[in-house]
Amino acid sequence: MTENEFLDLAAEMLKKNERRLRKRTRNDGKFTLADIFDRHTWKNIPTAEHSQLGIWFSAAVSKGYFPQILDAHQQNIHWHNLYKLRPLEQNKEGEQQQ
């Protein structure tokens, strides 16, 4: 899988699963790269590629490729760190106030 193919797939999975990720209550609402993907999709990606995919994902986040994550909180460059989205209510209120 190339970097662009992976980033396109990640964007598709984020769009598809963002609502589920925002509702997440386990682990204080935090999630890992594997949580973004559907279980079946993530299992189809060879384990040996996971760390490289994490590097690509983190770099893309820091460049603003996934604004819903970059905007949500300060992210760390390491793929295994957790990312946290703002609750939906805060997003709606914040947008209305601005």
Predicted regions and their residues:
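Short, positively charged loop/turn segments that connect secondary-structure elements
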Residues: 41-56, 69-70
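Generic hydrophobic/packing signal
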Residues: 27, 39, 50, 75-78
